[in-house]
Amino acid sequence: MRIEKCYFCSGPIYPGHGMMFVRNDCKVFRFCKSKCHKNFKKRRNPRKVRWTKAFRKAAGKELTVDNSFEFEKRRNEPIKYQRELWNKTIDAMKRVEEIKQKRQAKFIMNRLKKNKELQKVQDIKEVKQNIHLIRAPLAGKGKQLEEKMVQQLQEDVDMEDAP
């Protein structure tokens, strides 16, 4: 089963799905849904449409350069069927997919880490500018506790003197 890629959004197209446009020069364009086909007919650039994978890669939101992408290349050379080779290939595909998932997750975390550091710096700057608005929660409590203690001591002394 061959899974094609959408020309516009780079999404997967499974057999029996999507549509195909063949230009006069025999160039084949495959689309996963009518949304992609309409945008193609309007001559929109996939790198400028925010929901496409081309935009995400161009904007640095997704991993673009990695050795694991080499395994996805199309190979049109027929190979004689061998059960051992087939099993090894399937195991290798699973392993490559695991590695790719880990690398993508790490890439996303590194991308988010930069934003968190930037946000932290901005928060510190804002607190320094508006420090007068922040009042320490225990700022007036010390005097209040001291006054209560003095008042209780006086009451105790008054009670002892009364009998």
From Swiss-Prot:
Cellular component, GO annotation: nucleolus; nucleoplasm
Its quaternary organisation is:
Associated with nucleolar and cytoplasmic pre-60S particles. At the end of biogenesis it dissociates from cytoplasmic pre-60S particles and is likely to be exchanged for its ribosomal homolog, RPL24.
Task: Say what the protein does.
Answer: Involved in the biogenesis of the 60S ribosomal subunit. Ensures the docking of GTPBP4/NOG1 to pre-60S particles.
> Chief location of this protein?
nucleus
> Record keywords: Nucleus included?
yes
GO molecular function list:
structural constituent of ribosome
**What keywords were assigned to this record?**
Nucleus, Ribosome biogenesis
Name any Gene Ontology BP term: ribosomal large subunit biogenesis
Q: From the Swiss-Prot or TrEMBL record, state where the protein is found.
A: Nucleus, Nucleolus
Q: Quick one: which gene encodes this?
A: RSL24D1
The family line of this record is: Belongs to the eukaryotic ribosomal protein eL24 family.
What is the protein name given in its UniProt record? Probable ribosome biogenesis protein RLP24
Record's InterPro entries?
L24e/L24_sf, Ribosomal_eL24, Ribosomal_eL24-rel_N, Ribosomal_eL24_CS, TRASH_dom
